[in-house]
């Protein structure tokens, strides 16, 4: 076998997973058909090598949690840096993860491990209007929509998937089934409608009761 042929075959083997992989480009909308940001789509599908869970990051900027919704795989460690020039006191009473990071600036020395699937509602004990969410899932493939309601998932094994959808404004904060999806090689496009009336209000504008209401919904959903 010539050196050129051996090199060509080696490159083909390395490229094969990406050549045979599927991609999903999805548009998430509310019940009025408007783009829905901060919505989670997750996929459970064929057995195969799942992407390695990357560390998560939930920042605090301008007295807001950024991003408003963070999706992570079960077992992910999440850091909570404070980029503001004032101190924050982050906490959650949600059944999926109870924790407290007392008044601090900068970045706490240890991240928080999210080892139970579910919705974790975040608040700040100093700034009552701050509200954020960590969506913890066992599904290996997931993404959060941007302000235009768009998501893209790449390097998916071709096959049949079960789709789950979630948004903070869903009734009882329970995930919504998105049906089944058959993905072949290449790019597929889908549109999903979630049963919510409007997109999430801009973080920082929520009334002071929002954390209590959101926590109660997450607690009830876990029961």
Describe the function of each predicted region.
Residues 1-8:
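Bacterial N-terminal signal peptides that target proteins for export
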Residues 10-11, 30:
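Residue-level detector of alpha-helical transmembrane segments in integral membrane proteins
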Residues 13-14, 135:
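Small beta-barrel nucleic-acid-binding modules, principally OB-folds
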Residues 15-16, 21:
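N-terminal signal peptide c-region/cleavage motif recognized by signal peptidases
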Residues 21-223:
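Extracytoplasmic copper-binding redox domains, predominantly the cupredoxin/blue-copper superfamily
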